Amino acid sequence: MIKPQCYSITVFTERWREIRNFYVNILAAKVISERTDRYVDLMLGGMPLTIRPCLMGEAVSYFHLYLSIKERQAVLDQLRRNGVIVLNDGPYANFRDPEGRLIKVSESEAVLFKSPESLRHQTKAAA
């Protein structure tokens, strides 16, 4: 059976330095490797993320990023001090990176996927 492993998600940007600095300086992403103005490989919350400039006709990437931070208020205060508009929406605080990508922060992870085994167990328990 094939078992792929994701080693990076690449984000294309027209504002490489600004986006790089936002993720590193504001969201505390760890720089794994970097070639200035060409790419930066980051680790953000355990997720590998590569930022590259749009050089060969690539479109600016868009996505929603979900982060869980146990004590998120300090991060939200830092974002506000840096001029980032933060909106609260139930358990999430929402803000955007400099190119408009939506980032949602909660204090705990949402359950996005349950394994087939846990679903079978849940169904049997309900019966």
Functional labels for PLM-detected ranges:
Residues K30-Y62, L102-E109:
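Conserved short beta-strand elements that form part of the metal-binding/catalytic scaffold
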Residues I2, Q5-E14, M43, L55-A127, ...:
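Vicinal oxygen chelate
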Residues M1-R20, P48, F63-L65, V111, ...:
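N-terminal beta-strand motif that seeds the catalytic metal site of vicinal oxygen chelate
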Residues R15-K30, Q78-L79:
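Amphipathic alpha-helical segments
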Residues C6, V31-I32, I85:
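A structural signal for short, hydrophobic beta-strand segments that form beta-sheets
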